Curated annotation (Swiss-Prot):
<protein>
    <recommendedName>
        <fullName>Ribosomal silencing factor RsfS</fullName>
    </recommendedName>
</protein>
<keyword id="KW-0678">Repressor</keyword>
<keyword id="KW-0690">Ribosome biogenesis</keyword>
<dbReference type="InterPro" id="IPR004394">
    <property type="entry name" value="Iojap/RsfS/C7orf30"/>
</dbReference>
<keyword id="KW-0963">Cytoplasm</keyword>
<comment type="similarity">
    <text>Belongs to the Iojap/RsfS family.</text>
</comment>
<dbReference type="GO" id="GO:0090071">
    <property type="term" value="P:negative regulation of ribosome biogenesis"/>
</dbReference>
<comment type="function">
    <text>Functions as a ribosomal silencing factor. Interacts with ribosomal protein uL14 (rplN), blocking formation of intersubunit bridge B8. Prevents association of the 30S and 50S ribosomal subunits and the formation of functional ribosomes, thus repressing translation.</text>
</comment>
<dbReference type="Pfam" id="PF02410">
    <property type="entry name" value="RsfS"/>
</dbReference>
<comment type="function">
    <text>Member of a network of 50S ribosomal subunit biogenesis factors (ObgE, RluD, RsfS and DarP(YjgA)) which assembles along the 30S-50S interface, preventing incorrect 23S rRNA structures from forming. Binds to late stage, pre-50S ribosomal subunits where it contacts ObgE and enhances the latter's GTPase activity. Addition to isolated ribosomal subunits partially inhibits their association, preventing translation.</text>
</comment>
<comment type="subunit">
    <text>Interacts with ribosomal protein uL14 (rplN). In pre-50S ribosomal subunits interacts with uL14 (rplN), bL19 (rplS) and ObgE.</text>
</comment>
<keyword id="KW-0810">Translation regulation</keyword>
<dbReference type="InterPro" id="IPR043519">
    <property type="entry name" value="NT_sf"/>
</dbReference>
<dbReference type="GO" id="GO:0043023">
    <property type="term" value="F:ribosomal large subunit binding"/>
</dbReference>
<dbReference type="GO" id="GO:0005829">
    <property type="term" value="C:cytosol"/>
</dbReference>
<dbReference type="GO" id="GO:0017148">
    <property type="term" value="P:negative regulation of translation"/>
</dbReference>
<dbReference type="GO" id="GO:0042256">
    <property type="term" value="P:cytosolic ribosome assembly"/>
</dbReference>
Length: 105
């Protein structure tokens, strides 16, 4: 699974756990490491961890192997690397501070 199918899969899994403000950014030509970034907001550190863990578990169940997961210790911003898609699960405060949408659009 890759490209648009992977994007839709990830967005669906984030939506399963009520991730908020889900945005998919096409970063082809802007990033050498991925084609798409999906950014969403969790309401608490536990919610952020749950969303990221759900994406990882469902990806593995679908036969995908996440390349890495970063930020699990802090849980206000967790990054899940699925190759063609990188998922940023952030708390509201971190999302406002780093403004990834502005940086990559």
């Amino acid at each position: 699974m890759q490209g648009k199918a992977l994007q839709d899969f990830v967005i669906d899994k984030i939506d399963d756990l009520k991730g908020q403000d889900i945005i998919a950014l096409d970063v082809q030509g802007k990033s050498s490491i991925t084609d798409c970034m999906i950014i969403c907001t969790g309401t608490s550190s536990r919610h952020v961890m749950s969303i990221a863990d759900h994406v990882v578990q469902e990806s593995r169940a679908a036969g995908l192997l996440p390349l890495g997961v970063e930020g699990e210790n802090s849980a206000d911003w967790i990054v899940v690397d699925l190759g063609d898609v990188i998922v940023h699960v952030m708390q509201e405060e971190s999302r406002r501070l780093y403004e990834l949408e502005k940086l990559w659009s």
